[in-house]
């Protein structure tokens, strides 16, 4: 292992290293793709040990790590910083880095160079861009240079002010038709996977069936080829955020509060440290 935090092996018996070929084969073999976000070494290390396939260093860190209301304030330098820590903790999972707001929207050449910078400075397995037809040329340029790309359709958080809120997308016939078209365009441009966020399950099923490349859903129903959640959401660290597409597999906020309260009590009452915890 690259770090010394833990030495336990992963619980999965799958491939030693997840690559784009492995992800493609999972769709063909009807094996669901498990993806979570991570923003630091220790969390990424634990996810890798647990057998996660994809780790997304998401610009969602702007909300869950930095406390912003949107992902928009996150910078490219911040994404690179967090990605470096994540990559040090992982042996098996494929790591994808979100390209943050305004790192690629100005023009394709700037986006292409910034994607290259992410790959060179972090060692990530690929990058993710939000958008459909408008980023097709950028995706093509990036893939042609040897950089794997994941697309992102539906609710795209970097366009939150344009949408007017975190409401589901693809709910009208015109939106659904355009999303199907965008998905095919991204596939033809060379994307190896597409994230579908907060769209009707029936539409996600149609998109998934229409593509040779896999889809990974978040709030997009059960018919995608894989699922992704923000790790702090599924671990129950944010009690104030509970949309119906999030399942809490733990309630760590309660555990952390209780543990810290016990620590504070022991320190105040001079019960920590004791002799066996001293040198």
What are these regions (language model features)?
Residues 2-250, 254-279:
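Alpha/beta enzyme core
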